[in-house]
Amino acid sequence: MAVDQRPLAIAVMGPTASGKTALALEAAERWNGEIVSVDSALVYRGLEIGAAKPDAAMRAAVPHHLLDLRDPWQVYSAAEFAADARQAIAQIVARGRLPILAGGTGLYFRALLEGLSQLPEADQAVRASIAAEAQQIGWAGLHAQLARVDPVAAARIHATDPQRIQRALEVYRISGRPISAWQALPPGPRLPVRVLKVVLAPRERAVLHARIAHRLDAMLAQDFLTEVRRLRALPQLQAVAAPLDLPAVRAVGYRQAWQYLDGAGSLAEFRDKAIQATRQLAKRQLTWLRGELDARWFDPERDRHQLEDAIVGFLADRPAVRQASGV
């Protein structure tokens, strides 16, 4: 059997608030790595506190990639992410360093690790037309349109997911072919690195829920709401007819804060809604991660030694690895 000679990389996966950022930083410092963000909120400029974006000290200690790529009124697709991530990984490998893929956006991980079919490129005029229709008939009405032309995609896409509804209709209107047919085509070439997938997830749901609540309270203490007020004051966002349909504003926490600042409920109600939305996100992430059959799961508090052993074993054949203190 042929030996897989591809360079190595580590994917640090897990639900929100599970400790992925801390592990990625520790691993990068120990094994001469650079971090590639796999997070759909971190690509947006201005999303800092609510997205738990690595701060200046973290970025000074370890190189980070795929942060602050778009303004919050723009869109960034999974295909764009996969292309940018491949380029970043190739550059990291060329420098003789270890790529560490860290984040919790399942669509981005799938696009990168499994590949995507070659969908038609985005057409801003078509997107604008669909957005205008949404203002008239709502996203539920557009979802019904999608169900008529692509029932397979409509069954997979929730009626409250405007970004995916818009993309599916855009592809159909550009090409005349349902997006589900495009997605059934063979994916692109495999990733030119061999990846160890590690999942950080507390064994008890109550522990994860407590971490989620603690992180939200820490965000509020750091003046998260002022950050959202600054976003709301941007002229480009004020010019958007439906800002809550933008991917950046729909990011968990930001959407609930935006609605609160619109006058929807009390501060306590905002906190409860944000915590509940984050729990729901974590639940979806865990559902996706259970389908990653080749991933290895670790409790972030209990399994530190087992996690270290798994990484050390994976990297055993990697030459010239510089190490510092333990994970």
UniProtKB/Swiss-Prot annotation:
Enzyme class: transferase
Highest taxon in the source lineage: Bacteria
Chain residue ranges for the region called Interaction with substrate tRNA: 39-42, 163-167
Keywords tagged on the record: ATP-binding, Magnesium, Nucleotide-binding, Transferase, tRNA processing
Entry binding sites for substrate: T16, A17, S18, G19, K20, T21
GO BP terms in the entry: tRNA modification
Binding residue positions for ATP: G14, P15, T16, A17, S18, G19, K20, T21
InterPro entries associated with the record: Dimethylallyltransferase, IPT, P-loop_NTPase
Reactions listed under catalytic activity: adenosine(37) in tRNA + dimethylallyl diphosphate = N(6)-dimethylallyladenosine(37) in tRNA + diphosphate
Interaction with substrate tRNA, annotated site positions: T105, R127
GO molecular function, one term: ATP binding
EC number: 2.5.1.75
Cofactors (names): Mg(2+)
PANTHER family: TRNA DIMETHYLALLYLTRANSFERASE
Subunit details: Monomer.
Function of the molecule: Catalyzes the transfer of a dimethylallyl group onto the adenine at position 37 in tRNAs that read codons beginning with uridine, leading to the formation of N6-(dimethylallyl)adenosine (i(6)A).
Protein family (similarity comment): Belongs to the IPP transferase family.
The name this protein goes by in its record: tRNA dimethylallyltransferase
The organism of origin for this protein: Xanthomonas axonopodis pv. citri (strain 306)
